[in-house]
């Protein structure tokens, strides 16, 4: 796959994630869009690592760290969403005003 195609795919995934993050009213959908943004960043890291320095694996190792961070973020985010849903009976963003009380 050519370098430009991979960059176009990464920008496309990033823009879909940003659009979904801005327009979503559901917290689960916002979390999925955030994961999509992180995956597009990983795609860029691996692509530029392969293009500029293919013998060293700095970009690939950093991408593995980002994947581990995304997994931890998803686990914590889903547990918080589960707690919010249990207490508020809704996962809509505009209905969760946890800082008012």
Swiss-Prot record:
> Which Pfam family, any one of them, does this sequence belong to?
Oxidored_q2
A GO cellular component entry from the record: NADH dehydrogenase complex
Which parts of the chain span the membrane according to its record? 2-22, 32-52, 61-81
Q: Does the keyword Secreted apply?
A: no
Might you give the EC number(s) for this enzyme?
Answer: 7.1.1.-
Instruction: Please report the record's description of how this protein sits within the membrane.
Output: Multi-pass membrane protein
| Molecular functions per Gene Ontology | oxidoreductase activity, acting on NAD(P)H, quinone or similar compound as acceptor; quinone binding
Q: Does the keyword Protein biosynthesis apply?
A: no
Enumerate the catalysed reactions: a plastoquinone + NADH + (n+1) H(+)(in) = a plastoquinol + NAD(+) + n H(+)(out); a plastoquinone + NADPH + (n+1) H(+)(in) = a plastoquinol + NADP(+) + n H(+)(out)
Superkingdom field:
Eukaryota
A single BP term in Gene Ontology: photosynthesis, light reaction
Q: Where does this polypeptide localize? A: Plastid, Chloroplast thylakoid membrane
Q: Which UniProt keywords apply?
A: Chloroplast, Membrane, NAD, NADP, Plastid, Plastoquinone, Quinone, Thylakoid, Translocase, Transmembrane, Transmembrane helix, Transport
Predominant place of localization: plastid
Oligomeric form and interacting partners: NDH is composed of at least 16 different subunits, 5 of which are encoded in the nucleus.
Q: What does this protein do?
A: NDH shuttles electrons from NAD(P)H:plastoquinone, via FMN and iron-sulfur (Fe-S) centers, to quinones in the photosynthetic chain and possibly in a chloroplast respiratory chain. The immediate electron acceptor for the enzyme in this species is believed to be plastoquinone. Couples the redox reaction to proton translocation, and thus conserves the redox energy in a proton gradient.
Sequence similarity: Belongs to the complex I subunit 4L family.
Name-wise, this protein is NAD(P)H-quinone oxidoreductase subunit 4L, chloroplastic
In the UniProt record, the gene name given for this protein reads ndhE
